[in-house]
UniProtKB/Swiss-Prot annotation:
Entry protein name: Small ribosomal subunit protein uS4
Region (Disordered): 23-42
Family annotation (SMART domains): Ribosomal_S4 (SM01390), S4 (SM00363)
Disulfide bonds: none
Name of the gene this protein is made from: rpsD
Organism: Microcystis aeruginosa (strain NIES-843 / IAM M-2473)
HAMAP family given in the database record: Ribosomal_uS4_B (MF_01306_B)
Domain of life of the source: Bacteria
Any one cellular-component term (Gene Ontology): small ribosomal subunit
């Protein structure tokens, strides 16, 4: 399944608030479509699927990528669900978003893909790059790159900077000081249900 490029508010209406996907809120609180307001009891599978979809759409990863992250999280020490969230949060596109350099993760991904972002002084155009403690995230020393980020900063996606990051608005330089803590993950998600969803598939 490839990355979603359709109407974002339809997804928000179905899955709830996704801070990484869009800053807009759905006016209607029920799912889109003819049967959007149906109140039938959902199966456990449907609930797990919904949590998995939240993760996919919020971070903008494909099904294939998410499976890779689940496998990687399983091999790591610690809670699989928490490690999975950390892997997604420490992606470069998400880090750029959390630093306030872009209003959404798709916007941050575009900045990265178009070569506007540097890591430790070098241009990195791979959105899935895993940021590590000590990494310095900056903006390419070109007027266009600087202007793009400054404009984005006028409309930040999330108000608070996570505790593992620091950012200097004057120099447009951020630093990764550690790994994100669970309490700083902005998405409302039950990661255990995602792990359960993949338990027989991965």
């Amino acid at each position: 399944m490839s990355r979603y490029r359709g109407p974002r508010l339809r997804v928000v209406r179905r899955l709830g608030e996704l801070p990484g996907l869009t800053r807009k809120n759905a006016r209607r609180a029920y799912a889109p479509g003819q049967h959007g307001q149906a109140r039938k009891k959902r199966s456990e599978y449907a609930i797990r699927l919904e949590e998995k979809q939240k993760l996919r759409f919020n971070y903008g990863v494909s099904e294939k990528q998410l499976i890779r992250y689940v496998r990687k999280a399983r091999r790591a020490t610690g809670s699989t669900g928490q490690v999975l969230l950390q892997l997604l949060e420490m992606r470069l596109d998400n880090t750029v978003f959390r630093l306030g350099m872009a209003g959404t993760i798709p916007g941050a991904r575009q900045l990265v893909n178009h070569g506007h972002v540097t890591v430790n002084g070098r241009v990195v155009d791979i959105a899935s790059y895993q940021c590590r403690p000590g990494d310095v995230i900056g903006v390419r020393n070109q007027e266009r790159s600087q202007d793009l980020v400054k404009r984005n900063m006028e409309y930040p996606g999330l108000a608070n900077l996570p505790s593992h990051l620091e950012f200097d608005k004057n120099t447009l330089v951020g630093k990764v000081n550690g790994v994100v803590e669970r309490e700083w993950i902005a998405l409302s998600i039950n990661e255990l249900l995602v792990v359960e969803y993949y338990s027989r598939k991965v």
